[in-house]
């Protein structure tokens, strides 16, 4: 059973790599973005609350996010393992995830961090905005999202590094090459 996280800045290719890891390892990929969208679409109480923050481009507060993730991790398809994308973002969420896993006598096996230069990410996200017509992907918003990511995630990364389960992979390059690096890193981490 593989229980892992994938973290990285906006535009680093987390979603793409999460799909590929999921297919290759046979674990369910769980994106907090997908959880939020499903709750918003279903107009659940948590979804209605989350929508207020999402509409302003803000992170959804821990209290809401934690409950959504807890509910998702209680579903039967995660019994054979999971790959969480976009959670935890804060050290409080790290602690909450630890509690969820401890209740099932589980722990994380690997925390994979995709790394990339901010300027490359800005360039990549601006290109994606032109292709998709996403109005929320202008340079100021992109830089704000990157700043938020760095501000919140550094402590999370440090916590997992202390535990010896963090592995970093360069997220820049052709998608297949990044996937090869990711899979090699996962195998090395699992063998350690």
Curated annotation (Swiss-Prot):
For molecular function, the Gene Ontology terms on record are:
adenylate kinase activity; ATP binding
The family classification in the record reads:
Belongs to the adenylate kinase family.
Give the GO biological process terms: AMP salvage
EC numbers on record? 2.7.4.3
Name any one Pfam family assigned in the record.
ADK
Source organism per entry reads: Pseudarthrobacter chlorophenolicus (strain ATCC 700700 / DSM 12829 / CIP 107037 / JCM 12360 / KCTC 9906 / NCIMB 13794 / A6)
Q: What subunit structure does UniProt give? A: Monomer.
Alphabetic keyword roster: ATP-binding, Cytoplasm, Kinase, Nucleotide biosynthesis, Nucleotide-binding, Transferase
User: Gene Ontology terms, cellular component aspect?
Assistant: cytoplasm
- Provide the primary localization: cytoplasm
Q: What does UniProt say about this protein's domains?
A: Consists of three domains, a large central CORE domain and two small peripheral domains, NMPbind and LID, which undergo movements during catalysis. The LID domain closes over the site of phosphoryl transfer upon ATP binding. Assembling and dissambling the active center during each catalytic cycle provides an effective means to prevent ATP hydrolysis.
* UniProt keyword annotation of Transferase present: yes
Stretches for region NMP: 31-60
Which positions are annotated as binding ATP? 11-16, 128, 173
InterPro entries with a match to the protein in the record: Adenyl_kin_sub, Adenylat/UMP-CMP_kin, Adenylat_kinase_CS, P-loop_NTPase
Name of the protein described by the UniProt record: Adenylate kinase
Q: Where does the protein end up?
A: Cytoplasm
Gene from which the chain derives: adk
List the catalysed reactions.
Answer: AMP + ATP = 2 ADP
Question: Coiled-coil stretches, from where to where?
Answer: none
Q: Which CDD domains match?
A: ADK
Please give the pathway this protein is involved in: Purine metabolism; AMP biosynthesis via salvage pathway; AMP from ADP: step 1/1
Identify the stretch(es) annotated as LID.
127-137
Q: Please list the residues that bind AMP.
A: 32, 37, 58-60, 86-89, 93, 134, 145
Q: What does this protein do?
A: Catalyzes the reversible transfer of the terminal phosphate group between ATP and AMP. Plays an important role in cellular energy homeostasis and in adenine nucleotide metabolism.
